[in-house]
């Protein structure tokens, strides 16, 4: 007989368990007699039972605590004592059970030695006295025992007993009442020993992570009317009445922060505030939806939610699966099986070993004399396999390890160094994840530029490595037994404390490279455009990094391994470890190849944001991997690339090895110059992040021969910190549209503006040999792009960059003012900027660079021929280049993007004049006559993730949308990243969103180049006419200044001057957003754009041009759409996240997608953004009004208005958008009605026929009740009786007797009201934190009209029934029908299944608790299912295993 079951299966409260252990003398005597008769031996009851009871803490001595003699009663002789000792030594059942439980942490030894006298009649302070050996036994409640021992031993020393007596124990399931909890810590608080029960849901006052997570925990555990964790936003008022209405479940803006359980029922009147039953009142704040509220059961203020669902059991009982290692001895005195396993003192990392630990280690010989407090929690027990088998046989379950809080010096924060713990914790986690991630995780690049402090830290961390090595040994074992924490780490910014390890030769090489980069610009120049580059450090780093570091420290996520080698994936692409660099100003970026487990390390790690993998766009000519700069993705500008480019990852490309740069150069030197920028897919990377400021000195990049290996190795060394040159080259080809100085003069700050310059062609190696030919223009543009990317990335150190820029700007400004007149300067600069804009903004990089260089050279030569000599043309180009270099020098000390953007726009506006317009028109017509590939980029659109976007209608979506999936999702970020993409209008009914405009603006699909609207529409809707005249509407950012370059308008106007018949391209527009992360992007988008004053003068001239080309524009729209559709299928769009999008939807990283899948998702939201965006180009748009009106009517007819999601056939007839009521004449035409209006009309006529207006209808009048109406039967009180509790208990008992519960279910009926809805949500949450539970969605039922049967039909049925089941089945025929209408009721139903009887009983108790509290609104029923099975097959093995074990153990 087992005296007390240690499993803690008792489901009652602590008071109920207390009653179970009250001593009963009669029962004791009867048990003694039965046992002695059954055993038929001379062994006494005391020998058999008393030691076992003692081992479970049920008996304590009254007058002494000498536990070794506890098994001796007054009349006992020495033989029995000797027999008991022998049994303990032989490992009898009691000893095995006790030892197994001890090792599993289920109880704590209470070997107590005291030195104070004890009064006779109390059990609070048992004292051991050497003289007193007279004992009496009394069965005690174990909680009183625990309390007694705790009070007695708070300051007493605990010596191990040398004799083999049984010891007193305390069960995890036998904890004292909640009211006694303060006693557990009150005695030791003076000594600053916080002895908390780490595995219990209620926690003591002290939290070891309080210093780190105090603000988070306080906000989570405090009852507030609203959640302070929400980011406050101008559109997110706390009252819940704005656009971001947390209390409106139909609001699209609620999704990222949506409550765990939105409306579990369908109700009438939704969408109107006074009937909105989903309004969350202040007494049920957000925390109660995320984590259950236990205030009713636990008023203890020390409760802390540790987010461990195994602890959130009903009424804090320890269920059968919860055998957490709650109790053990002090960590300073560790027991392990035969001392074969490392103890806690060994497993603690060196950095967390405090002086106390060291002293303990030194004094191991005197540990027997140390104080041992039994209430200290420890993870030190590591059961051997033999003991673990015993534990599993006894409890039939696995031991669940404690959360990691137990690692912090047993809950005491007194001696723990948090900073050291963080480092060691990261290392342990890194080692723990090394196995599973080593084959997939991108390793650290061996060429990461390291801080000089890394070497010192690496030397200082050698002691930590020893602890990591020991932890690695543990991690090879069963993860259940591993001392490394498996729970999520706290929200600590560990990334700032992670370090990189470099071998000595690597470190020396890095130092040399850093030294070279200080002295020469050429050191940072890569040979191939495949080589990634990123900016060096400038002033913007000072906020975050130490001044003595040459480069900012690399940040990486804690789980990453710190391996030095670059791995090569199966496709031959090299994986670079991503490194997050704070505040990178040069934003030239691209991405590394996508692997399955590839996530970007970013500062959003601290925010808990989900990092979605970003697929790389790699074309076969340039298959090499590119490094993603994650700091750009961190804040609001995540790059999203087309998913269709995945097929390119399988290209058989040469493996790029940093160890052999020569081979790489040989294999790619031929292709890298010509092919690397030839595809417009690569251009999709070129967002405003590709900041291309100006180069200040002659282009040092054109070293193709002997220096190639050296430069490649250097550039690869800097690869992890540099953005690739391809990105910058694309950016510069785009930005050459804004100035000829950018298109040509940036290649070398003096020479490259001459289109046929031989110096430039000499520098650019073989491609520039023919100066005036296409190769020359190609080379010059490529050189300019490389130089601009170098300048934008700030390859050189700040000092050299500043010096060269100052010198060049000084000399060039003087020279230009001397050499050229102002008019010629303006003319050539203006002409070249416009012409290169015409060519470069359009398509593939290759054709664009060729056309832009040719156009700029021709235009500048013609304009300068008019104005002055060729020298003045050169001087004017020099002037603009030096102005831009002035801008870049300004930007290097500040945020380079803003400065260069402002300065270059200023200079270009000065340089632009009316004299150059004719030349630029001619050159642009030549350049535009070429068929160029098209780039589409919308900087403001968030992309839609790759869901099944073929679902276009709301009816289809309403069929597939399973609302319970969102409601039962306990992981906010999961819901956010899966369901909360930006413009998912089809999931919401516009009728119930009064804050969103239902009248859509007219579609500008023909002549609209609005980058916010038509650019994101696919196929015919999203492709625009080349002559379209609309200018981007821009949102004004929070700073109050529009950061969008006015060069967008410039591009529009320059494209609309002269249009030839063969023109098929659409200009490329994007909007740069001046945000924290992409602040430097605006320089690339606005470097040589016109100022607003110049734009006003331009609009008048262009308005005249627009009138002339309007007819041509309309005629060519169809051709353009065909061309652009073809291009859109081949080259996907890239949409940059606007700052508003990043704030509305906190998904910094989003999945890749194809733009042509997106139009249905984004049309409504596009119009909404247009509505919100201030139109700063109103005067310009007025000129285009006639063109836009031309296509308005068509698009309005194309798109039917869907304003009701209840209509299942809503697409077959016209919709009425206006909310005004229709007149009788309108109503008479059924064609003009939507389905719902049609039904309402009939409903009103039927109600008038039956004279039904308001109030109740007699239940016997079936014709009135089941009339044609959409109204539901409404019940304020549920028409059911509550379940008899006695019958319920018996039914549950009968169901669970056979060990199966899958043949039964629980049915909950409840009414529609706010109160009931909130109760059901809480009940759902409480059910779903249990395992093996399936809860259905709350659903309505449809009811057919009733019918009475007469006697004849009943008699016929009885006769069939008497013939047997087969005859009844075969001969039964019932063709009874009705001619009325069905009605539905507002009584909701929910079904709950449980896989095992344990879960079934728990679910029934949970449901019954709420049904008892609300008998008129909620009713519980338990039903049996014939031939029942689990709802899904996942639970089948669970049920079978439970059944087999149940059958086996029931026979014992």
From Swiss-Prot:
Residues 14-25, 442-471, 535-552, 695-712, 808-825, 1102-1117 have a biased composition (Basic and acidic residues). Disulfide bonds: none annotated. Residues 427-436, 1190-1199 have a biased composition (Basic residues). Residues 728-977 are annotated as: 62 X approximate tandem repeats of S-S-[KR]-[AD]. Residues 665-680, 719-731, 738-747, 766-791, 798-807, 849-891, 1006-1016, 1040-1053 have a biased composition (Low complexity). It is found in: Host nucleus. GO terms for cellular component: host cell nucleus. InterPro entries: Herpes_IE2_3, HHV6-IE. The keyword Ribonucleoprotein does not apply. GO terms for biological process: regulation of DNA-templated transcription. Its main location: host cell. Residues 1-25, 216-242, 336-368, 427-471, 516-931, 993-1053, 1101-1165, 1177-1209 are annotated as: Disordered. Residues 336-349, 516-525, 582-594, 639-664, 1148-1163, 1177-1189 have a biased composition (Polar residues). It holds the Pfam family HHV6-IE. Residues 1024-1072 are annotated as: Interaction with human UBE2I. Keywords: Activator, DNA-binding, Host nucleus, Host-virus interaction, Repeat, Transcription, Transcription regulation. GO terms for molecular function: DNA binding. It comes from the Viruses. Transcriptional transactivator. Homodimer. Interacts with human UBE2I in the nucleus. Although this interaction does not promote IE2 sumoylation, it represses transactivation activity. The C-terminus is involved in dimerization, DNA binding, and transcription factor binding. The approximate tandem repeats seems of variable length depending on the isolate. This is Immediate-early protein 2. It comes from Human herpesvirus 6A (strain Uganda-1102).
